Structures are given as structure tokens and as C-alpha cells.
Amino acid sequence: MVSNGHFAYAEDDPVASYEHGVQVVDEDKEFNPNLSKYLAYEGVTPAGFNYHLISVFGSQSTGKSTLLNYLFGTHFSVMSETERRQTTKGIWMSKNKRQDCERENSLPHLQNNRMADNILVMDVEGTDGRERGEDQDFERKSALFALATSEVLIVNIWEHQVGLYQGANMGLLKTVFEVNMQLFLKDKKSTPRSLLFFVIRDFLGTTPLQNLQNTLMQDLQRIWTSLSKPPGLENSTIEDYFDFEFAALPHKNFQTDKFVAEVKKLSMRFREGHRDPSKGNKTEGGIFLSEYHRRIPADGFAVYAEGIWDQIVNNKDLDLPTQQELLAQFRCDEISREVLVAFDEAVVPFETKQAEAAQSGNPEVFAGLGPAMKNARVKTLSAFETEASRYHKRVFQMKRAELEDKMDTRLKVLFSGQLTAAHKSGIAQFSDAVSAAVKAGQKKGASYDFADIVNKEKRIALERFEDDAKATVIEGACWSNYTQELALYQKDLEKISAQLRKDEMRRLATRVERWVRSRLGESVGLEFNALGSGRGGSGAPETGDKPSEDTIWDRIWSIFVATVLEAEQRFTERASSFDASLEEVDVGLWRLRRKAWGVLRSKIDEEMMEGNLLLKLRENFEDKFRYDSAGVPRIWRPTDDIEGLYTKARESTLTLIPLLSRFRLQETNATPQLDRWVGYTPSAATPADEEDLVPIGGVDDDGKSLEEEMTMLSETKRQDLTVRFKKAADGVYVEAKRSAIGGMTQIPVYFYILLLALGWNEIIAVLRNPVYFFMLFLCSVAAYIIYQLNLWGPMVKMAEAASHQAVEEGKKRLRDLLEPSDIGHHGMKYKNGTEQYEMSHVRSGRNATKINERDDDDEVEGEETW
């Protein structure tokens, strides 16, 4: 784009395009979008508030651009000496170049007397030009734009124009006053001030500068008075809104050297100054006062200026506060996006890791998360405050709060995730540590204090959680408080501790139950093994009297109660080291009693299984039948009352069946008060405490009564057991009877007399024959030696064994020979355990008929196993 005979801006060559500055607004009222690039190119953007904006007004072709070029070292286009036409079109801007030259050439001790930094100069299109004619729209818009943005308004007039209305730009100044009043009405909270700097050109000195100053002030007062003021401002003065400065410069062409010197002198006035209250607020130093500054940061000036011009060119009411707020919103949002880039670089890696860990189901405590969050938050807020605090305060605070919310929303998620991970990992580590310590104590075989282990590991877990939480806390963030999380963590630790204690008490109860099972198994087994032993041999106790069979349940109950009482003492003593509550101990003891009864009942059922009980009844019967009261085995003779002893022993043993069929105490003649002994269900018991318990009749509501619980044998089993026992007893009786009958075979005395009479010749023959006699002698000597060595007994036993074996073998072969034939007698076999009895038909006296009847029954029944 070409304007004023040179490029206004070009993208390819910034140095060439910005040699003459930048055209802010062209003659068609279009705003230049590259203004921000120019400010960045000139290094003004990072200046913040350390910049100043000056605008120059004046009639066309009065040397405004020339004045600026000499005064600020700019390169604005100037009018050709041979032509009288418009040169500056629209509004141009350039940075002060004289400042850079002075900084390079001045000595260090003169640095404080140089021009202010970052002075921006706007060259406004001249008024009263023939190109615009009577169109004063751009004149008014440009004046409003300059007044809304500039600190100092330079009015360029010639000396001979002072006192004139149009020539002295009084019409333009009236426009300036009117638009200033318009701006003031929109911004009632403050009174914006500007400096009107009159530079009188071609000053000859004939009329003193003070007189020219008075003339101009009178004209300005008159214009101000003629303005229509809004309500409440009727008595306002021009000094309420403007300050005035005056300077005079000699003729440029006729007094060139003096002009240059005065311009240089004038340039030194463009620096920071202040009001001295001791001198009536008189300005000292430079002309740039802080109250003139529009408080628009340099990095937002381009956006602000564009918004101002858009309002002006569209004939909208210009509202500077609103524009400042809009600018602040725009720039704060922009700055927020910029600073969040660095924030994302610091935070996103942790967010990604935490999300992956949560998705995998293994939350992880990340080291360094807390410092990273703190640094990211502090640096982001600091960077935002550095850049954005220069803008509208309310907007800045609002945007700062929004930025904090954005960051805190993400940081809070990280914070919560970190605490959640610390919570879960802490609970897992606590549980594992307690279990490991308990196992270590069990392996050592020594007693360990479970409560001490839990308290120690709980303290370690709390310290670890607090360390992780403190490392993640962000100071100043209201959400960065882990009090609730810590309370929840402590609550879960207590819950886990209670569960671990409950599990340990369960294990303790299991160990005690095993001990009870072992003790009851031995004690109850001994009672049943000693059941009905009627002899003083192996079945009787080593010391003391034989226990009565009638009191077997009393003894079992006493053993049971004593064993459980000892187990309860063991449980209570061990549970005290768990720091268990009374309720938990009560539940444990209640469960122990129920479990112990189940163990006893199981042991009784085992002992009273049909095979076991039948064996014990047979042993009881045999002890009473085969042994006398002293425990000596009976040798059956035909003269013994076998049938009487058999009947007595059988009936005595049969009395045990009804005795054993019901758990009844002999002392009270009633069943034990099991429901009272077990006790009521503790109030602290949970359904989990009862789910593995076997219902007990008379205690639980399972439909069984206490009598049914104490019934060990049903009526059907009793009858079946009685029948089978009688058959086994009959077999023992038959064996005893056969043994008695076998003892009757004796050799008569007359047989020996007959043998001597009939064998006398043979005896004489032996005595007369030397060989026979010698053989007899040898046999006699051998018999004598055997007698002396006491070997007759062993030899007789060996002979008996050999003969018995020969007889058995003969019987077997004879049986095999007669087996296909129906002729012969068949023996009956009675088995019990590993014993086998073979019986043939025994017919003798009055017992022959009875034995034959039993044999007939046995042939029908077949073989019985016990």
C-alpha cells in the first residue's frame, strides 16, 4: 500500500516499511492491523506503562510533520517546497528517534537529562485542507481518537495566526473541548486530563511570548464558556480538564541554526515530570505527568486503539472505560493462554501418568508432584500478574480469578488423585505390614503383641500419608487441605485395623478350636475306650477304681466344660494383647462355646458310629464274660455255669445301649442346660459371625429341641444295634461252649493197666535185646536232659503247634474233597474285626437241641461282620 509517496507497510521488509513510521488510519478511515507489529518492531510492546503518546494538530501545510521530524527525529513525509498540497493523509505514528541517538552519544552523567523512553508521536492529518473541503467528519473523528489515546496534544500555529479564529485552529480546539466533554460524561469516576502544548512557529520576538500566551488563553476561555455543558458541570473551568504549555520557535528557513538549537532545547522538555505541592502543584521536570497517561499497557495499545477507532468511525458513543475493560478482557485472555502453555508443560505429564495409573487400577504416588504443582502455579500466576496487572484492575482481578480457577481445577484433580493413591497404597502397605509382622512373630514361636504391631504400623502409615499430603499441598489454595482426607484415611485405618483384629481373633479362635478338638478327642476317646471294661487288666485304669458306666456322660460333660473353660481363659488372655473390645471378646467366647459343642458332638458321633459302637459293646461283653472280677481269663470246663455268665454279661452290656442313646447326666437325671451354657447371642455379633456356625437344637430356632439335640441314637438304630450285638454275643457263647466240651476227652486208668498186661511180652523183649535196651537208655538220658534244662514246655508247644497245623491241613483237604457232595456237616463262621471262628455241630446233653436251632438260624442269616 502506497501513501504519501512511500510504503506505509510491507510484510517482506520491516525495516523499509517502517522507515517513515506506520500509518495508523488511512485517508479512507481504515485502521491498520499491523500496528502491533510496528510496536513490537520498535521494542515498545514489552514497555508496559513506560511509554508516552503525543499527537500533533494544526492546519494543513503549516509544517507539523517538519516540526515532529526535527523535534523527535522522525521521518514523516513533508510537503514539497515547489508544491502546496496535502502531504499527511490519515493518522501516522512513529517512535522518537532522537532519544536513541542521545542515549548513544550522551555521557553517563547526562543520562537523567535526556528525553523520556518510548515516545510515540502521531502525525494527524491537517485541518482546513482543500482536499477535504467542508467535510469535517474526519477532523472530528481524528481529534476524538487523539484525545482518547494521547497524553499531550501539540497545537502547531504560526505567530501571525495568534488572535485569529480559524488560523489559530480555534475551531479545532472547540472540537477537542467538545469531545473531551463527551468522554468525561462517559467516565464520571475520574477526570481525565490532557496537556495542550502550543508551539508557536516563526516567532520573531516582537510580541512577548507571555502576551501571546494570554491571548490564546483568553480565546480558549471564551470557547469553553460558549460550550453547552451537561447538568452539574455548568461551573466547570477549562483548567479542570486541561493543562497548558507554550513554546516558541524561530523561523526555520531564516534562522535555521537558532531553530535547530531551540528545537533541541524544546525536546528536553519531553520527559517525566511531577507536581510540587509546596509550589502550588507547579510542574517540575518534564511535561509527562502520570495523570496524563491513559494507563493502557503497551502490549495492548494496538487492540485498544483499534477498538477506539471502531467506535468512532461507526459513530457510536465512545465509552473509554468500556473500551478499557474490553481491552483488559482481550489482553488478559490472551496473556492467560500464553502463560498456560508453560503450565501445561509442567502439569500434563503428571496428568497423563495419573490417568494411566488410575485406568490400570494401580494408583501411584508420584514423587515431585507437589513441587511441580507449586512451581507451575506460582510461575503462571506471576507471569500473568506481570503482564496483566497493568490493565483494568477489576477485569484483571476477575481474569486472575478465572486463571486460578482453571489451574486449580486441574491441580485439584492431581491433588485428589495423589491423596487417593496415597490412601490406597497406604492401606495396602499397612495391611501387608501387619500381616508380615504377625507371620514373623508366629515363625519365631514367641508370643507377639498384636495391638502393638497394629499401633506401630498405623503410626507409620499415618506419617507416610501426611508426608505425601504435605508434599502436595499448595499454599494459598483454599482447596489444598487434606484434613478431610486424613480423617477418612484414619477412619479406614481403624476399619482395616478392626478387620485385621477380627481376622486375627478368628485365627486365634481357630487355634483354640484345634486345641479343644485335640483335647476332647483324647479325653472323650479314652472314656469310650474304657467303656464297660469289667476286668482289672488292660481295660481298667492304672490307678483308682474303675469308673462307673452309668456316669459316662457326667464325666464327658465335666471334661468338656473344663476343657472349654481352659480354652476360654487362653482366648481371653491372648485377645487382651489384640486390644480387643469387650464386645469382640464376648463374640469370640460365644463362638468358641458353639464351636466346642460342635467338636464334642462330632467326636461323640464318631465314637458312636455303628461299627465303632458295636465293637465297644462286644469288648464290654467279652470283658465281663471271658474274665473274672480280678481280670483273670476264664478256662471253660463242662462244670462251669457258662449260660448264666453269658446271660449276665449280655444283659449288663445291653443296658449300655439306652444309656448311650441319650446325653443325660446321672447326677441330675436330665440333659445338660446347653442353652444356658452357650448363652444368648451377643448384641455385637454380625451375620458374618454366625454364617459358619452349625445350628444347635434348643439354642437356635432351627426346629430342633434340646432333647433332640441330646439324642445320640434314634430308636431304630437302638433296635438294630441290639439285634446285631446279640448275634455277636451268641457267637462268643458258642465258642466258649465248644471249648468246654473239648476239655472232656481224657484217657481212662484201666486203659493203662490193659496196656501193661497186653504189652508185657514186648517190654521183656526190649529189655533182653541190647539194641532196644540201648535205644531205651538213650531216650531216657535225652528225657532227663530235657527235664533238667526245662525244655519240656517249649517242646510240647512245638509238638502241639505241629500237630494242630497237621490237623488243620487235614481238615482243609478233607473239606476240599467233600465240597461237591451234600453229605457232611458245614461249619459256621463268625467274624468280628480280624477274628474268625469255625464251629461244627455240637450235640451233647440238653444243649444239643438249642445249638442245632442256632445253627439253623445262622444258616439263614449267613455270615455277619463286626
Swiss-Prot record:
Biological role stated in the UniProt entry: Cooperates with the reticulon proteins and tubule-shaping DP1 family proteins to generate and maintain the structure of the tubular endoplasmic reticulum network. Has GTPase activity, which is required for its function in ER organization.
Transmembrane domains' residue ranges: 747-767, 771-791
Binding site for GTP: 58-65
Membrane topology designation: Multi-pass membrane protein
Enzyme class: hydrolase
Native source organism of the sequence: Coccidioides immitis (strain RS)
Subcellular localization: Endoplasmic reticulum membrane
Cytoplasmic topological domain: 1-746, 792-866
A Pfam family that the UniProt record links to this protein: Sey1_3HB
InterPro entries: G_GB1_RHD3_dom, P-loop_NTPase, RHD3/Sey1, Sey1/RHD3-like_3HB
Family label: Belongs to the TRAFAC class dynamin-like GTPase superfamily. GB1/RHD3 GTPase family. RHD3 subfamily.
GO terms for MF: GTP binding; GTPase activity
Domain GB1/RHD3-type G: start-end pairs: 48-305
GO cellular component terms, A-Z: endoplasmic reticulum membrane
Residues in the Lumenal compartment per record: 768-770
CDD domains recorded: GBP (cd01851)
Keyword Nucleotide-binding applies: yes
Compositionally biased tracts (Acidic residues): 854-866
EC number of the protein: 3.6.5.-
Region called Disordered, residue ranges: 840-866
Gene name in the database record: SEY1
Subcellular location, principal: endoplasmic reticulum
Keywords on record: Coiled coil, Endoplasmic reticulum, GTP-binding, Hydrolase, Membrane, Nucleotide-binding, Transmembrane, Transmembrane helix
Identification of the protein by name: Protein SEY1
